Amino acid sequence: DYKIHYAIKANYDTRLLQIIRKYGVGIDCASGNEVRCAIEAGFDPKSIVYAGVGKRDKEIRYAIEQNILAINCESIEEIDLVNELAAEAGKVVNIALRVNPDIDPKTNHCIDTGQADSKFGISYEEIIENIDTIKSLENINIIGIHIHIGSQIRELHVFENMCNKVNVIVENLTKLGFEIEFVDVGGGLGINYDMPENEPIPNFASVFAIIKQHLKVG
């Protein structure tokens, strides 16, 4: 099964959000304010994922209060912080691990978020190094992983590479005792800026077909 989550940072006009909600689309948030906008627009909290770097304590607290689907954690330190704030609230919070898959998205390095030298996400090796600490945290429940490899991706084989890497990561985490319920995959399909008239809308169908064929989880 799959579900599309709209990146609310693109446009959070209430009228647009009402239309999106009617089609059963979920919401991907990058800030506490975006979580609030989604809640106020009437989205089911369990259709909201909170990703994004630099989350502030008060933003995390709000997401915890709203019982959203998951908070995507960017670092070992953020996992620990979410656990601490969840304990303060007397809750067990669902999280997803943002894993850095070390994949070259064949895009501008400034918008590349998935290679080893990127500041985004947690390397698989770092997860293994901290596995005992992660498992000892009592107020988080790891239910998913989050992969985002970059923006303006024009070479479709990159998405196949991403799926293959995700399959290995999920298999390994499952062997370590984690129950991975979902995989949140991201990476912006590129716009043909050179000849936009030849491709006014990106080839989403091909990307979805690749993910359906190669992603072996769920």
Predicted regions located by residue number:
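Short secondary-structure junctions and interdomain/linker hinges
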Residues: 1-3, 218
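Active-site-proximal beta-alpha core segment in soluble small-molecule metabolic enzymes
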Residues: 3-182, 191
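Alpha-helix-loop-beta-strand connector modules within alpha/beta enzyme cores
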Residues: 92, 166-172, 205-218
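Short glycine/threonine-rich loop-to-helix capping motif typified by GTGT followed
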Residues: 155-161, 192-208
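Conserved glycine-rich SAM-binding loop
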Residues: 188
